[in-house]
């Protein structure tokens, strides 16, 4: 729970700094109840996003399926297998607080699971 609050704090900071609607949407999703938390499989990422994309997942990334694209993913949490598969494909798996610090001003972010 504490980790989620720290992440929410960083995402709010990114929204205040950039005023980009994607960060406001992510804040609203993270503030909702745990029962409504999102989960996305790596196979869905592989199907929906182009190679080299920057993806925001306001929930957990799960390891079902395969991923062949090099993507940078920022998520609330990752399963061990999802993190391994993303890194094996040449991508990066970052927790949402670090992702928000590093890529808050980046254009072309894709929201999956929102």
Language-model features: locations:
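Extended polybasic, low-complexity segments that bind anionic RNA or targeting/receptor surfaces
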Residues: 1-114
